[in-house]
């Protein structure tokens, strides 16, 4: 099997209308279609889907570091932070990082899904780890 790439991201949400507003305002996602319990967006070429599932437990999501990270230019980090603050988005306390690890801001959607705007690349991270993390094995 040959994986061609990422097909889509789908998030379960408790309130479709509230989540549509969030994804449009925070990510500038273009709404493509909306049904009774589903919405599809184009997020800079990424297919983003929301499914409304009102009655599922959501508390455990707060305990996990699982998140979706989007790349942004370092020069845009401060304006991204101000944009999130202006929208009253729940911004999370970031973790301590070395300068080589670049910069990030973490935040959640109304259902607690975690997101990150990150200024680094995989190549930069691997170089940093090769240089500084001698306990790691590279393939």
Curated annotation (Swiss-Prot):
Quaternary state and interactors: Homodimer.
Subcellular localization(s) per the UniProt record: Cytoplasm
Protein name: Metallothiol transferase FosB
Function description: Metallothiol transferase which confers resistance to fosfomycin by catalyzing the addition of a thiol cofactor to fosfomycin. L-cysteine is probably the physiological thiol donor.
Taxonomic superkingdom: Bacteria
Molecular function terms from GO: magnesium ion binding; transferase activity, transferring alkyl or aryl (other than methyl) groups
EC annotation from Swiss-Prot or TrEMBL: 2.5.1.-
Gene (name only): fosB
Ranges where the VOC domain occurs: 5-120
Organism of this sequence: Oceanobacillus iheyensis (strain DSM 14371 / CIP 107618 / JCM 11309 / KCTC 3954 / HTE831)
Cofactors, names only: Mg(2+)
Classification of source organism: Bacteria, Bacillati, Bacillota, Bacilli, Bacillales
Binding site for Mg(2+): 8, 67, 116
Keyword set, alphabetical order: Antibiotic resistance, Cytoplasm, Magnesium, Metal-binding, Transferase
């Amino acid at each position: 099997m040959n994986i061609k790439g990422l097909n889509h991201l789908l998030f379960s949400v408790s309130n479709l209308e509230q989540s549509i507003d969030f994804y449009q305002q925070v990510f500038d996602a273009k709404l493509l279609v909306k049904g009774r319990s589903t919405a599809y967006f184009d997020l800079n070429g990424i297919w983003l889907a929301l499914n409304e599932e009102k009655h599922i437990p959501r508390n455990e999501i707060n305990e996990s570091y699982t998140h979706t990270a989007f790349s942004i230019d370092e020069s845009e980090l401060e304006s991204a932070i101000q944009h999130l603050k202006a929208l009253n988005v729940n911004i999370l306390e970031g973790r301590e990082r070395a300068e080589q690890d670049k910069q990030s801001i973490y935040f959640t959607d109304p259902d607690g899904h975690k997101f990150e705007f990150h200024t680094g690349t995989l190549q930069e991270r691997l170089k940093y780890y090769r240089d500084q993390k001698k306990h790691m094995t590279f393939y």
